[in-house]
């Protein structure tokens, strides 16, 4: 009796995965449409592997202090397409909250909400999975525009801590909707942060204060715990419970602008990362810090060796005003001019992956004062509006600057 011939579709799953692994992405897309079994095998074993470690869109485990911000949960194949859009500058641009008076806002991004300061008022806008992706009318607000400008704000859990230009600040409980005004400094508050009951604030020319947060009759009261004489432009508590404070000075003639402060003792250590000014910094993990500097560089600093581990320079010699980290490999840098944003890959030292800036001619000299991103959207604060670049737009015109970047690096 003649044996039945084995069909290709009858092969076991491991054999199919091995064969499919030799195909390019276009061929995989065609095969995934052949039958449901091929679609499942390719999605689970191939698309998931190809999309795991992609820049900005990868689904690998992220740092614990960098939770997912995606308003839409994309499948593995869609993540690959989104990465290609980031890589080749393919996006649709929208403008929100335009204002004639020059001032800059701060933003914080979550899965469901965008928090944005408008002078002295904090507005909370709902994000949706619909085409608009952002509701212009705020769902709720904190404070009033006529109050002193909000210079910096931080949200952890359901608590917001913010500092104002007149030296005051506030702690706001989002769950109970309770506002507690605080007096933090005698001059402009440049940055704040908190971790649990520990609150930190720093002024433009005064000092850095460590506070203990107490709740009395439902209101927050900050009790001064420690004061350090130095003032800083940017501060951030370490993600290991806030045992250390990374701090960057606005100006230091000795090029020792980056410091590490022991929270318990107030002892300051100078990190060997030569820079006259650090405008913004973030903790990558409990041992490494990302810094945006006046000297046109973004640096990765290891606190264990107190040395720079890697340095990325801007191709056009612009200072780095602000940073956003995706929790894995991607770092976005907001630059000093033309509301330009650079994308860097921590796995590729020196190399700028892509640049994003608007071709529109209005207010095109503004720095990027604050930025935030998820897998499909980039929020950019200029001095006259909020720009949103939506990368979930496959048919948008590509604005690819990699040719110029390759020429600069090589």
Q: What is the meaning of each model-derived region?
A:
Residues 126-136, 168-181, 207-229, 238-244, ...:
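Per-blade loop-tip surfaces of WD-repeat and WD-like beta-propellers in eukaryotic adaptors/scaffolds
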Residues 28, 111-115, 157-161, 196-200, ...:
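Structural hallmark of WD40 beta-propellers
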Residues 318-347:
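Loop/turn-rich, solvent-exposed surfaces of beta-rich toroidal or solenoidal domains
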Residues 313-319, 350-372, 409:
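Conserved blade-ending motifs and adjacent loop-strand segments that build the rim/top face
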Residues 118, 163-165, 202-205, 248-254, ...:
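Conserved strand-to-loop turn within each blade of WD40 beta-propeller repeats
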């Amino acid at each position: 009796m003649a044996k039945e011939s084995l069909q290709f579709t009858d092969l076991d799953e491991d054999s199919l995965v091995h064969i499919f692994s030799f195909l390019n992405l276009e061929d995989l897309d065609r095969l995934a449409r052949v039958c449901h079994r091929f679609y499942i095998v390719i999605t689970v074993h191939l698309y998931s592997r190809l999309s795991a470690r992609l820049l900005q869109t990868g689904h690998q485990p992220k740092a614990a202090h960098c939770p997912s911000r995606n308003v839409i949960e994309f499948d593995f194949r869609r993540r690959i397409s989104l990465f290609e859009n980031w890589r080749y500058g393919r996006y649709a641009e929208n403008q929100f909250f335009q204002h004639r008076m020059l001032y800059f806002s701060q933003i914080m991004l979550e899965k469901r909400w965008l928090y944005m300061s408008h002078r002295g008022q904090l507005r909370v806008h709902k994000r949706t999975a619909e085409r608009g992706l952002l509701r212009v009318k705020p769902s709720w607000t904190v404070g009033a525009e006529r109050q002193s400008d909000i210079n910096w704000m931080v949200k952890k859990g359901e608590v917001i801590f913010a500092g104002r230009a007149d030296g005051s600040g506030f702690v706001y409980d989002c769950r109970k909707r309770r506002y507690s005004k605080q007096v933090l400094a005698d001059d402009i508050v440049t940055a704040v942060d908190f971790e649990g009951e520990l609150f930190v604030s720093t002024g433009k020319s005064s000092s850095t204060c460590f506070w203990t947060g107490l709740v009395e009759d439902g209101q927050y009261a900050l009790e001064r715990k420690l004061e350090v004489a130095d003032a800083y432009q940017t501060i951030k508590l370490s993600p290991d419970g806030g045992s250390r404070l990374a701090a960057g000075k606005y100006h230091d003639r000795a090029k020792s602008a980056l410091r590490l402060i022991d929270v318990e003792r107030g002892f300051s250590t100078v990190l060997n990362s030569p820079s006259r000014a650090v405008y913004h910094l973030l903790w990558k993990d409990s041992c490494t810090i990302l810094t945006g500097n006046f000297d046109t560089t973004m640096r990765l600093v290891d606190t264990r060796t107190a040395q720079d581990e890697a340095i990325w320079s801007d191709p056009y010699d612009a200072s780095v005003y602000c940073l956003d980290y995706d929790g894995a490999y991607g770092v976005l840098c907001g630059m000093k001019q033309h509301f330009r944003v650079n994308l860097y890959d921590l796995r590729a030292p020196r190399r700028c992956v892509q640049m994003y800036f608007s071709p529109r001619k209005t207010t095109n000299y503004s720095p990027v004062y604050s930025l935030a991103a998820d897998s499909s959207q980039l929020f950019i604060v200029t001095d006259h509006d909020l720009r949103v670049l939506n990368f979930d737009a496959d048919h948008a015109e590509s604005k690819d600057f990699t040719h110029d970047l390759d020429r600069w690096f090589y």
